[in-house]
Amino acid sequence: MFPSGKMFLDKRRFAVIHSVYKADSAAYKYISIGRWDRERSQLRRRRGTQKLSGKRTGSGRYSEKAGRQRPTTEGATSHREGISQVTQRGHKAVMSGFVSFFAAQKRSMILKEEKRMSELKRTQLYDVHVAAGAEMVDFGGWEMPIQYPDGIIAEHLYTRQVCSLFDVSHMGRLLIEGPERQAFLQHVLTSNVAALDVGLAQYCIIANENGGAVDDAYLYMFEADNYLLVVNAANTEKDLVHLRAALTGFDCTITDISKEWAAIAVQGPKCKELLMGLNGGKQLTEPMKNALGIVSLEGHEARVAKTGYTGEPLGYEVYVRSADAAWLWNRLVELGAHPAGLGARDTLRMEASLPLYSHEMGTAPDGSEIPIFAVPLAKFAVSFSAQKGDYIGRAALEKQQRYFKRYMDRDFADMSGLPRKIAPIALVDRGVMRAGMEIYQGDKLVGWVTSGTMVPYFKTEGEGLSTVILEASGKRAIGLCYIDSNILTDDSVEVDVRGKRLKAVIPARHMSVGAPPFARPLLYGVEEEAHNVGSGDRTPKALELVKKALENHQWRQEQCVNLIPSENTPSRAVRLLSGSDPACRYAEHKRVLAFYEREVFYYQGTKFIDEVERLLVEEMRAYFGCTEVETRTLSGQMSNMAVFSALMDWKNRFDRKSEAKRLGYVMNNHIIKGGHLSAQPMGALHDYIAIDPVTEKPAVVNFPVCADNPYKMDVEAAKKLLDRYRPELIVFGKSMVLHKEPVAEIRKFVDEQNIHTTIMYDMAHVLGLIGDHFQNPFAEGAELVTGSTHKTFFGPQRGIIGVNYKEDDLKYGLWKTIQSRTFPGSVSNHHLGTQLGMLMAAYEMNQFRDTYQKAVIDNAKSFARSLKAHGLDVAGDPAIDYTETHQVIVSVGYGEGPEIAERLERNNIVVNYQATPDEEGFTASGALRMGVSEMTRFGFEAKDFDKLAGLMADCILRGTDVKEEVQKLRGEHLEMRYCFDDAEIDQVLEELAAKLV
């Protein structure tokens, strides 16, 4: 079994996997697509006159079941002799696992075929393919490998589980240069070229005036002074004619550099590790899709793009000088990659529902032209930005989009503008689909299969992050189709397979890339968990609930070492007060001008909570060192939303009659670099951030990080971005935080450059560290501070907002807006019980802050040093003992984080698995994020963290069961510190506890 988060790290496992794939390939030979390109002649194999069957001979049956065997040419001294042997034996030649062929019957035809094949173009890697035993075919005028000896099934599965190499050097590589290169590309491509910056790529389509596709392509910006446009191999000459015809009037040039540069697609979960092994372990690109990088691979220059045609969440396309192509290919094979041919490339892209020109673009099975908006990727590849002007096909595409929008609302009254769409299709009945087969709904012809075959997949067991990828594989009949636009996801249809109607369905997709590093097959018909409805006597359930609650409380509070940095345990006093009356009461209030801005409450019985809230504001002003505090928000996320809403309202204060303008550019920490989710366009910022009309993306720019320390901001690079974008709002703060934020330096710079902005610090994780041992944000120049009150701070789970505006400041009006956007804008009942508990937490924090904060910082540094000494890979700068906060980060290997975190939990050590700045997502997490604040409060000191570090090293590195020792260690630290132990307070708390029972 292979756990979902694991890579294959040793040669023995490679050998096992390889043997499994070979066995699967032998068992699952199948027939696939009969035609690759309707505008070209039938594809032909290099051996004899065998050719891909346009009649789909043997369609739907496995070759062994059809009584056929793969031709054997052992002992042949030449290629011609091998073909002759096959012919003399009377075998019908069958391409293993892909398409059936008929053997040549006449020697003259063999000679003619060999002469024709010798006239085909060859890539820089042709000799490498032949030496590896590849079966070569005519593909769009190129002699290309269709498969290698292991077969297409093996190649497909190896790509999905390890790493495969694809020769994509046959594709056209066009260099666009000159002063008007961007304007030209804006005119001939559907995408918004202005959205590209150096280091980025984009998918695009070359459109004709009718809104059909001349070709689809990828545009790369490796350098500031040129673009690289990569087009389909079979269309290169046609594309060049089209593009050069449109070049008139533009001061730029098009140069075909296909011969000078080779291209290799390196695809699969292990590809990043293999390529980084050639790059000295350095980052290839940013971990986002379409990111680019120029790197040195063992001294050879390479241009690396995080792109690909397999659907893999981890995949790169590498461009190298032609002279370096064979070296790179062979070097990657040495490291464990396997070569793969066009056959596997087709099954992989089909599983990913990626279009192939001449199948899902170009001419439809009925001879009509497929509109661009019939292809789902048009949503990303077509722009109507004003930046583009009147580009080729714009008018037709705008019409198509109008129909597309109607269909999204399920308005199919008029389908004339976009009658059909490309969609995935899956057979329910046993059989195999082929391109061109008709699709029916009842007696009505509703479309055609455009691509179809039998595709392998790995079976799994378990669910969620516990899903395990098994060695066993299965197969499923899937494909793509061109179908009536009013056919919806999950609709049932029938496919006419050689006169027999087979049941099929239109799924949403065939696979998902949302849980890297693996692409996950989505099998149609897998039952979702049933939605149960409670019934019967609830008394036993209530008893079970309280028993489990008691068990969980004892486990977390008495037996576990809790290291999740976003958590803390409130004191007994805070917990008791939070559960007391006025919990579940209401105390809505606001300032009323008619009463000289006095607070007016909407409910009676609120005098006590009124006093509590006023006292809490006073305590938090003292803690922050600021002028105003809002305590009614219920979380850090709500605090941020209230601030963003207020900033947007403040921006529009002069015009209440027009549509409100959203916030312009915001500068923040990217979520992959540790930024808060609540400060991202996908989070609390979502409804308040403008779309940049140039990039057509949210107007957000991210703080750059140091090349040698991705956890620390590169201040000088940040200053350049500040000067370029001049953001309206700057948001400091991270959830993966090892360093102080450079608030003072940025404040000084924006003031000097006269950048009118608002500086906000989201201190959710470090709110309890504000002070001389960490940072004083307002003293350093922050205007706004938001945060959560339950991480390093001592409070229950709430939010808070502080500002440093005075009544005569212009932005004091912003403060008043923040108040109104809190109530009634964000919250009605502001949870009075936890607000009461929060006042006690504020008393505790102000009383013990100095000793607590010093202990937290010292413990974090000591813990980091101990973890390192015990052999673990601690992230951060060793010059500062790896951290300046409560957090410590340990790298455990790409994709290993979830499993290691689960293993530690089984041993009563609760941590947070974390994706590092170089990783693609939480399922690919290769680190553990830990915080020392909670255990510091329970009395852990340097010696205790050192002992804990040793236990963790034993568990992580050696797989030792340390549960009993962890329980013993925790059992020695059950008394909370940094809280009041006054006898009178304890007596009253006992009385309160008795009343709460």
Language-model segment annotations:
Residues 120-126, 143, 247, 251-418:
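Glycine-rich, acidic
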Residues 1, 527-531, 618, 922-997:
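PLP-dependent enzyme catalytic core of the Aspartate aminotransferase-like
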Residues 410, 414-417, 842, 849, ...:
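Conserved small-domain helix->loop->beta segment predominantly found in fold-type I
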Residues 2-6, 37, 41, 67, ...:
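N-terminal amphipathic/hydrophobic targeting modules at extreme N-termini
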Residues 529-534, 608-611, 615-873, 932:
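Conserved PLP-enzyme active-site core in the AAT-like
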Residues 110-147, 525-615, 978-997:
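N-terminal glycine-rich, Lys/His-bearing helix-loop that initiates the first secondary-structure elements
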Residues 370-526:
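Glycine-rich, small/acidic residue-mixed loop/short-helix segments
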Residues 101, 116-207, 212, 343:
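Acidic, proline/glycine-enriched N-terminal capping motif
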